[in-house]
Amino acid sequence: MNTFLTFDLLLVLLVLTNLLLLVSSRLVTCIRTVAAQGVALALLPLVLGHDQVATIAGALLALTEVLLKGAVFPWLLFRALRVAQVKREIEPYVSYTVSLLIGILTLFAGYGIAARLPLPDPAISPHLVPVAIFTMMTGLLLLITRRKAFTQVIGYLALENGIYTFGVAVARDGSPWLVELGILLDVFVAVFVMGIAIFHISREFDHIDADQLTALKD
């Protein structure tokens, strides 16, 4: 199969996973979706198979992406999910239908924004930056429109996935991969801490709704 066709198919998969995150109320589905998204993103530079993977940093980043987002993060979230005994995001601030419509609008807006950015030439794919922007916006939507702390952690992961995708678009030598690796390690620490926090919160309270947790007092 043509390399760039495979690359674009991975981008289509990324778009579909974003849409699924916006419409799914089942937390198990969201965790599995963001894990699949992370594994697919790790394949993007490997599919290109030329200068971007020529550096040790690029290969290391892809391997780290698969291990953390495909195994470690889901394990942490599933463990906390079992303890909290929650299954669904019942009452989001914004309905799933409206979230989907906003997501579709941001996908189209991404093409307009990408056309105005000073990106490296030639572009790897005309769809790469718009999809990266869409993925970042999906993460932000999950962060601000969902009540459950679990879903907000998933939104944080989706946001980082968008940053990673944008890094693939601008990477032309080894240095951008080092920046991305640093971001990924920061995300690992953040998700680890969030997982522990959710674990302890669920033991002390009968909910993990972020809007109620903001009202806690000494």
Where are these regions (language model features)?
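Alpha-helical transmembrane segments of multi-pass membrane proteins predominantly involved
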Residues: 1-218
